[in-house]
Amino acid sequence: MKQVRLLPSATVRAACAVAVAALAGCAQIPRDPIIQQPMTAQPPMPIAMQAPGSIFNPGFAGRPLFEDQRPRNVGDILTIVIAENINATKSSGANTNRQGNTDFNVPTAAFLGGLFAKANLSATGANKFAATGGASAANTFNGTITVTVTNVLPNGNLVVSGEKQMLINQGNEFVRFSGVVNPNTISGANSVYSTQVADARIEYSAKGYINEAETMGWLQRFFLNLAPW
């Protein structure tokens, strides 16, 4: 008997490759950062001006001679003192009790008295519901990060953002910050507390083996989505 060996076609091999790639892509859940704006900005190039022939150049660094060094232009840097301490507690409860009772007789004709003489109907119902719930959360974040002014609003407020990355062994940790700063809240040390920043967004995350160990596997997530309980 002649044996014929069938080799997998290119279509089957391509389908297997696509399936493996899809499963590999499910191993990690992509997570978009909460800060979408650029992390830094370069100041615009100053317009070339003719030298006035004096020691002081009014166009140097874009600052007048007797002005303080607080950031106010795109590209200036500012130190953010992160001091976040948020506590939240919530509790709720519900209690409902309802009862009902109905009793009535069915009128019958005289010739049917022997058949429906005891046809009395009564119904009783009760419904009771009780539930309690509670939740609490506490978050503390302290640190410093230096950010860059990326935009100056018409009212003078500064849109800032910045990123700090730290590579520790096999893990890459980074801190991102963005918000709107009022120049009047900037101290003489060129710093401002995060509690004084409007629309503040703080992100602390990491990439590495520790972060992967805290992530649920794709097969476990698959069965978790299928489980009805």
UniProtKB/Swiss-Prot annotation:
Q: Organism's domain of life?
A: Bacteria
Stretch forming the signal peptide:
1-25
GO molecular function terms noted in the UniProt entry: cytoskeletal motor activity
Q: Which GO terms describe its biological process?
A: bacterial-type flagellum-dependent cell motility
Q: Just give the chief location class.
A: membrane
PROSITE patterns from the xrefs?
PROKAR_LIPOPROTEIN
Recorded coiled-coil stretches: none
Which Gene Ontology terms of cellular component type are present?
A: bacterial-type flagellum basal body, distal rod, L ring; cell outer membrane
The UniProt entry, under NCBIfam families, shows: PRK12697.1
Q: How the protein assembles, per its UniProt entry?
A: The basal body constitutes a major portion of the flagellar organelle and consists of four rings (L,P,S, and M) mounted on a central rod.
Bilayer topology: Lipid-anchor
Its job: Assembles around the rod to form the L-ring and probably protects the motor/basal body from shearing forces during rotation.
* Phosphoprotein listed as a keyword: no
**Localization terms from the record:** Cell outer membrane; Bacterial flagellum basal body
Q: Which Pfam families does this entry report, sorted A to Z?
A: FlgH (PF02107)
User: Which organism encodes this protein?
Assistant: Burkholderia vietnamiensis (strain G4 / LMG 22486)
Instruction: State the InterPro entries in the record.
Output: Flag_Lring
Q: Which family does it belong to?
A: Belongs to the FlgH family.
- The name this protein carries in UniProt is Flagellar L-ring protein
Q: Where is the lipid attached (S-diacylglycerol cysteine)?
A: C26
